[in-house]
């Protein structure tokens, strides 16, 4: 859709990336690291200073201390961390439960390592359906993948959901991969429920995070993974021969930038304001917005406008009205046939959002 948006000169609310500048303090830190000669390979698991800063951040947020030497690895983005975690644990014939709609890297990665993706759907109103997941578990289930806040749904897992997941995995050897790259994009006073908060989950989980989502630097491809040392040892075996190490000057910059918690504590309010701005405008259109509790994605039902399939409707809206969005069916293995939903990214400048709303109200 980004390609079509470019061809049509449309406002691009399809792909999930910000269109505003990053904090100058952060870009200055990167420049300083380069000028100071930090331009060669970093240690394979990441700079000790950055791993230490991550450990301090995690402990401050969740009250649990990961060992920076054995339980934290810096990665080339969240997607690489997911790829590496799956590569570390999936063997031919293993089953991995994926909750649709799902980020599009999950299923192909499972298949690449010889596993079999087992798809279940979110329930009513894009909520986690614990019973559907429970029914999908078999003796061959190797892992369960969860995502909160959720892309593309914009919903979050709450304490009750996490406890249900812990209950269903207790007594099994199933590994949890918890994709939490939008951890700081949780709105309306809700608390991010991380797998880290639950000992029964934490002891079996790879927990994945992204600096790009938090600090508006998606092009840097910087993230990190947390896991118990036994799991992390397997993770690093793949990581070493996949990327070896992530970008060195950016690691130096992030290690320094994390020292001020305000640099991530202000993120929820920043994006909640953008969510609200877009949502207020969207409610004046013929689209029906779904609940957005986190992430920077807003779903909207267009059933009152058209009965076209979402892929065709999304293309037509881009070509005829100059606004690009993602059809949600592409995030499913087997999309619901009566679903008419588009995903919009509101990680944009206010002017961009206002112009987008004007176009959406014309549909």
Where are these regions (language model features)?
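Active-site PLP attachment segment
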Residues: 198-234, 249
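N-terminal small-domain helix-loop-helix segment of the aminotransferase-like
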Residues: 1-77, 84, 257-259
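Conserved glycine-rich beta-strand-loop-beta hairpin in the small C-terminal domain of fold type I
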Residues: 255, 271-279, 289-302
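Active-site phosphate-binding strand-loop segment of PLP-dependent enzymes
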Residues: 124-190
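PLP-dependent aminotransferase-like
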Residues: 87-146, 159
């Amino acid at each position: 859709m980004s390609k079509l948006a470019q061809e049509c000169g449309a406002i691009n609310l399809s792909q999930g990336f910000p269109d505003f500048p990053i904090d100058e303090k952060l870009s200055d830190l990167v420049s300083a690291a380069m000028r100071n000669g930090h331009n060669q390979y970093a240690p394979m698991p990441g700079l000790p200073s950055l791993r230490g800063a991550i450990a301090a951040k995690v402990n401050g947020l969740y009250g649990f201390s990961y060992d920076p030497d054995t339980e934290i690895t810096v990665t080339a983005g969240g997607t690489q961390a997911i790829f590496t975690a799956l590569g570390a644990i999936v063997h031919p014939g293993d089953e991995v439960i994926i909750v649709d709609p799902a980020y599009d890297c999950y299923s192909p990665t499972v298949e690449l390592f010889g596993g079999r993706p087992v798809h279940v759907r979110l329930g009513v109103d894009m909520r986690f359906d614990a019973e559907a997941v429970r029914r999908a578990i078999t003796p061959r289930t190797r892992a369960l993948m969860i995502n909160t806040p959720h892309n593309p749904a914009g919903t979050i897992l709450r304490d009750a959901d996490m406890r249900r997941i812990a209950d269903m995995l207790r007594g099994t050897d199933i590994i949890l991969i918890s994709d939490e790259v939008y951890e700081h994009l949780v709105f309306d006073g809700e608390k991010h429920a991380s797998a880290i908060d639950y000992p029964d989950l934490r002891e079996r989980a790879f927990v994945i995070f992204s600096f790009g989502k938090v600090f508006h630097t998606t092009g840097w491809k910087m993230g990190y993974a947390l896991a118990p040392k036994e799991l992390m040892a397997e993770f690093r075996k793949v990581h070493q021969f996949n990327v070896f190490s992530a970008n060195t000057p950016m690691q130096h910059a992030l290690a320094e930038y994390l020292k001020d918690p305000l640099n991530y504590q202000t993120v929820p309010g920043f994006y909640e304001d953008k969510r609200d701005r877009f949502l207020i405008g969207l409610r004046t259109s013929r689209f029906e917005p779904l609940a957005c509790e986190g992430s920077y994605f807003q779903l909207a039902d267009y059933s009152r406008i058209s009965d076209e399939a979402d892929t065709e409707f999304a293309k037509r809206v881009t070509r005829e009205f100059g606004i690009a969005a993602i059809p949600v069916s592409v995030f499913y293995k087997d999309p619901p046939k009566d679903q008419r939903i588009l995903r919009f990214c509101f990680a944009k400048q206010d002017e961009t959002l206002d112009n987008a709303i004007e176009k959406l109200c014309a549909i």
